[in-house]
């Protein structure tokens, strides 16, 4: 015999709590199942709330390593009710180079941590990292020559990853031809390439 349940709402206020039957009701079903032959009163009623799986996205600038730190958390895809979580630990990305959606070759010690929500209500399903281009700084000097050109040979690049080097060529521009200190502009005229 089979009975139908009328679709009425039960409320669960927290995890590991007794579930109140509330307005849940039985209805006649198939194979001779009559609701009048059964009652919910006095029975045992249990509902398991499973952890919700989350996919995490980390994001940082290129640093020449495959380290993926929980502190680089950018977003989760399925948090509920406006909750927030954080991440701890670190894993290993499959590549050190600039790209989006790089998978982990190892999750290492990456773990969810409480925010406004409880980490115990969620499980970490997958983690990817977006690695963005590293921002370089430039500086230099030249002798007065009555023009605003800043040739690549007069410009030094900084904020490179330790041990890495680049070639650069082309011409940028400064704000004035006169002696003084100026912001380098028109950096699109400078190109960089591997040594």
PLM region descriptions:
Residues 6-9, 13-195:
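Short loop/turn motifs that initiate or flank beta-strands
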